[in-house]
Amino acid sequence: SIFDKLWERHVITGQEGQPQLMYVDQHYIHEVTSPQAFQGLRDAGRKVRRPDLTFGTFDHNVPTVNIYDIRDVISKAQIDKLSENVKDFGIEHAAHGSELQGIVHMVGPETGKTQPGKFIVCGDSHTATHGAFGAIAFGIGTSEVEHVFATQTIWQVKPKKMLVKFTGVPPKGVYSKDFILALIARYGVAAGVGHVVEYAGDAIEHLTMEERMTICNMSIEFGSKMGIMNPDQKTYDYVQGRPGAPKDFEAAVADWKTLVSDPDAVYDKVIEIDVSQLAPMVTWGTNPSMGVEFGAAFPEIRDMNDERAYNYMDLSPGKKAEDIDLGYIFIGSCTNARLSDLQLAAKFVAGKHIAPNLTAIVVPGSRPVKRVAEKMGLDKIFMDAGFEWRDPGCSMCLGMNPDKVPDGVHCASTSNRNFEDRQGFGAKTHLCSPAMAAAAAIAGRFVDIRQLPEVQ
């Protein structure tokens, strides 16, 4: 498989089945999981071994209204510390407020540093996003961040391999976010544990790079640290011309073309999903597997987890997504804040206005995305419809910055996690596609977007 080929290229020492020392081609860092790692280097009198293979950005704590108005003491300390650390250790970075700044899993691909064949790590669980390019990419802990800083290597046990084949043509109103939410709803949040998940099939091949990133992004919610896809012409076209793209691009592509799974590749587990049978997805509970197709009733209580989820969400079995009274809409996050996500959402709000008593925010995932979106007039479409148009950052995906959902309020969110208190204390999160979130903003509740003229 592609994973085997990449793994073999990066092993320095060690036996399969045991921890093996792996070479890291690209290390992304942000302000939350790096301070202690940098301090460890200082205490040991070490340098960052390959600052040229390290890239930093500011995202988790960044306010999206006034990015410099950081009132939380810990948030400010983390941002100030990363500014100091990247300077002291000579690390390239998208400075706070700079023209490149944004969510780490968007900035990496946008700069062209994420490429097929690379072994990529970052102190963030959604690092699997970069696997959409045909790279091994996964999240690591702070002590591992320090190890990579010091050695440009990491100890890792080779995981088992799972193949998830998405086949067929999706119905109108069904998007890549629905593919991954449907997979997780069917098989659970632990199905991928101990495996790298390779996503393949004609339905994946027909997706754009941005749509593919959405699927790989949520591998961790499926239980897998790593998601990967075979690179193809769309991948090469995306990377070409970006600042970090290989200088001898033709030679790089010739190599990348060898980095695909062979027809006879063997997997430990295979799952097939016919996307023509899928529907728009909405989560009802407190983990991403607690989701249903729009129109389906929420399930009966099967265990204590379900009971707790229903109590927290103030919902009950038999209810449907359209019964939820929404108070907030969040379009953003490293899952769905790319240009195509914003274009899709804008289609559903153009010339309309959000429902009364509703707060709706759009947070582009990076400064470049925001810039292009504004050139296209997307900001005006959203603001005319009553949305707030924000600066880039992780924003309302997690309660680490000023963007929080109030206690007890239901939020339609294009992010990746619906845990208790994830978007703020007592916040009730419903994961969905940008199209579902945008349409819900207008109606004040979830609607069947398949019936709307925007999808025809």
UniProtKB/Swiss-Prot annotation:
Report the co-factor binding details. Binds 1 [4Fe-4S] cluster per subunit.
Listed EC numbers = 4.2.1.33
Per its record, the protein catalyses: (2R,3S)-3-isopropylmalate = (2S)-2-isopropylmalate
Provide the residue positions that the database annotates as binding [4Fe-4S] cluster: 334, 394, 397
Does the entry feature the keyword Lyase, yes or no? Answer: yes
Q: Function, please?
A: Catalyzes the isomerization between 2-isopropylmalate and 3-isopropylmalate, via the formation of 2-isopropylmaleate.
How is this protein named in the record? 3-isopropylmalate dehydratase large subunit
Q: What is the lineage of its organism?
A: Bacteria, Bacillati, Bacillota, Bacilli, Lactobacillales
